[in-house]
């Protein structure tokens, strides 16, 4: 097992990565809880696979647990489903020190964290991510939210977990499409600030797709280490943390425009990263050969590289709800070379139109 620490001015918490971590949930989680009571929040896909193992481990460590099982999918990341968590907390007479344990992917983690941030103005919570995307990205860093019909993650809070458990073994049951979606977020780290890691990913696609445990351990560790370092510098996304949104301005627009859940988050980010790279190319910041390498890596990993065919006005309306908008102006994370990105304001519509029309014609 590998243990990383994320250190912030007001808190510090461990990220445990390895095989068999879920069965050690009790010993790894209990020391971080202020009270020996917890609500496990999971979904109807994960529950039959991992709920009892998680619950038994926590109870063996003296943590009394209740459970709420939510419907699976991005389409349920809303107020109605969030209220199911609050109803369960009320039914169990939860207190401010009662912990919430997120057992699931990014949707479960985001909603559980937001519920914890809201419950009696702040309750402890734990992340036990069961998807690759959640293990390498959404479970680390304290971003919590639900969606609004107008946009992705529009309603939320920064609320850090007490501990994160990333069990590589649970990835064995992940559907291929969801596994590939997680790889998009892995590759993102190489693109924003780690060229050697990007090159390693290019070489390791077969091993990653085969879910080789050594390759997965390295991918998850590097991703979490990079995210922990960035969040440690900029918890509330006032500066460098914005770089983690590479591909997300386009990607969130795709998710909202198609309807949440039609494309997986990682699929939308993959297409968004290609659009960001092609925008940078049009602006003269990125070589065409680098764009081709990005596209090739994503295609090898069974990820989409062509966005929906929408008019520019539709894109601009959808992207106008992006959380990086400042002073009414869109801001994009764009690569200027492989392994390096920067935040750009004032990207001309002529570049966006050319890139989007180019993709539509493809």
Swiss-Prot record:
GO terms for molecular function: 3-dehydroquinate synthase activity; metal ion binding; nucleotide binding. Signal peptide: none annotated. The keyword Magnesium does not apply. Its main location: cytoplasm. Binds 1 divalent metal cation per subunit. Can use either Co(2+) or Zn(2+). Keywords: Amino-acid biosynthesis, Aromatic amino acid biosynthesis, Cobalt, Cytoplasm, Lyase, Metal-binding, NAD, Nucleotide-binding, Zinc. Pathway: Metabolic intermediate biosynthesis; chorismate biosynthesis; chorismate from D-erythrose 4-phosphate and phosphoenolpyruvate: step 2/7. Zn(2+) binds at residues 185, 248, 265. GO terms for biological process: amino acid biosynthetic process; aromatic amino acid family biosynthetic process; chorismate biosynthetic process. Its cofactor is Co(2+); Zn(2+); NAD(+). One of its GO terms (cellular component) is cytoplasm. Pfam families: DHQ_synthase, DHQS_C. Its EC number is 4.2.3.4. It catalyses: 7-phospho-2-dehydro-3-deoxy-D-arabino-heptonate = 3-dehydroquinate + phosphate. It is found in: Cytoplasm. Belongs to the sugar phosphate cyclases superfamily. Dehydroquinate synthase family. Catalyzes the conversion of 3-deoxy-D-arabino-heptulosonate 7-phosphate (DAHP) to dehydroquinate (DHQ). This is 3-dehydroquinate synthase. It comes from Laribacter hongkongensis (strain HLHK9).
